[in-house]
């Protein structure tokens, strides 16, 4: 298998601070911050101009702060100042699937955190990131890896939901058997 340094594959562009809007307007676009790399629970928007733009094919990585190394992909919009956009160079656009690159970087996030700089606020080390070696697999192999990993992620999510429901069932059975422990409605001796 051929390996390639990320520095050959990617170019980096740092995000910018913007005025944040809670509601979307006709002139606004999505404003992506660190929380958005994990989920879409709290969408924010901006009308600020001259922003760093992310396209769905780009990889986003939290560059600064306690969450440095957190990775997101498949997002589009204006990018906040603590995030860097990783764009595939022309030579590799058709050779590397963004999801494959994204899961590779997710697997390296702890390593990137451990090698970050800054005494009080961690910052990713650009050289460490760009020196990472990516295995250059065929498109079909990349798609297969993504399919398997997505299946695993779905199963993990389902299992977590099952455990949450089981925890609620245990609490419910406890209350049914012994009553509410706060008001002791079953009059147990304390």
Task: Give residue ranges: language-model regions.
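Histidine kinase transmitter module recognition
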Residues: 89, 104, 155-158, 162
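A short beta-sheet element
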Residues: 33-37, 50-106
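Residue-level recognition of specific faces of alpha-helices
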Residues: 82, 120-123, 148, 165
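Basic, amphipathic alpha-helical recognition segments used for DNA target recognition
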Residues: 2-13, 74-76, 84-136
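Sequence-specific dsDNA recognition surfaces
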Residues: 4-59, 190
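Non-catalytic DNA-recognition/assembly elements of restriction-modification systems
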Residues: 1-17, 131-146, 158-190
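Short helix/loop capping segments that flank catalytic or ligand/cofactor-binding pockets
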Residues: 41-42, 95, 143
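A specific heptad-register position in long alpha-helical coiled-coils used by two-component signaling proteins
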Residues: 150-153
């Amino acid at each position: 298998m051929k390996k390639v340094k990320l520095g050959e594959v990617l170019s980096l562009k740092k995000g910018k601070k913007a005025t944040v809007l809670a509601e979307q307007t006709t002139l606004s676009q999505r404003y992506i911050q660190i929380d958005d790399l994990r989920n879409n629970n709290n969408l924010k928007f901006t009308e600020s101009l001259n922003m760093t733009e992310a396209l769905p094919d780009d990889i986003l990585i939290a560059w600064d702060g306690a969450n440095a190394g957190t990775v997101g992909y498949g997002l589009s919009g204006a990018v906040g100042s603590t995030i860097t956009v990783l764009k595939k160079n022309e030579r590799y656009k058709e050779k590397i699937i963004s999801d494959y690159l994204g899961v590779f970087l997710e697997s390296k996030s702890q390593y990137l955190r451990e090698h970050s700089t800054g005494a009080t606020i961690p910052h990713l080390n650009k050289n460490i990131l760009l020196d990472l070696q990516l295995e250059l697999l065929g498109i079909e192999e990349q798609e297969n890896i993504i399919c398997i990993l997505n299946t695993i992620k779905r199963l993990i999510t389902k299992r977590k939901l099952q455990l949450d429901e089981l925890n609620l069932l245990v609490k419910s059975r406890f209350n049914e058997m012994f009553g509410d422990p706060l008001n002791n409605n079953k009059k147990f001796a304390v």
